[in-house]
């Protein structure tokens, strides 16, 4: 049985202090993969579909010679959502080569599809400092980069924009 899921990146407008309304959202409808059977295949597909445009600008120079560098967050988030209904947990830790490093864990089993970036620096990923964490970003919503990467990995997925009202004007 195929499990269809959605990942929504909602756009909010502030109504009043602490009160927000969704005015639009990017939605990705996709098929979840089977864990752990499809883990190696999905990991390879994610790595094979990493593009420079997904890498934050501050990491792009280093990424030129180290193609996994700067991709841990969105690659890990994509992996997490492809296996959304499993027991995977998001982990992060401060690291020497960038601000944070991200991976997922299944119990004590570390699953880090961008760990290879550390080989160029001759150091190990900072798993010893890792803690289970929520995704960063407002309301822990998935990043658009993660949705775009997931669409590349699974071309049959449907990525679309749904607008509920006109784009609100910012009031300062």
Question: Each PLM stretch: what is its role?
Answer:
Residues 2-172:
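A structural boundary/capping signal
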């Amino acid at each position: 049985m195929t499990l269809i899921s959605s990942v929504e990146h909602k756009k909010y407008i502030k109504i009043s202090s602490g009160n927000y309304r969704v005015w639009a959202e990017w939605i990705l409808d996709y098929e979840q993969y089977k864990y752990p059977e499809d883990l190696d295949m999905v990991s390879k597909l994610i790595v094979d579909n990493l593009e420079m445009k997904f890498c934050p600008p501050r990491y792009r120079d280093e990424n030129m010679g180290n193609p996994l560098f700067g991709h841990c967050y969105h690659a890990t988030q994509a992996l997490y959502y492809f296996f959304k209904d499993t027991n995977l947990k998001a982990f992060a830790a401060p690291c020497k080569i960038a601000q944070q490093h991200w991976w997922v864990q299944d119990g004590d089993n570390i699953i880090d599809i961008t760990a290879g970036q550390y080989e160029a620096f001759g150091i190990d990923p900072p798993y010893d400092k890792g803690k289970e964490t929520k995704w960063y970003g407002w309301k822990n919503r998935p990043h658009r980069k993660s949705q775009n990467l997931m669409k590349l990995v699974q071309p049959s997925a449907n990525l679309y924009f749904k607008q509920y009202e006109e784009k609100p004007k910012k009031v300062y």
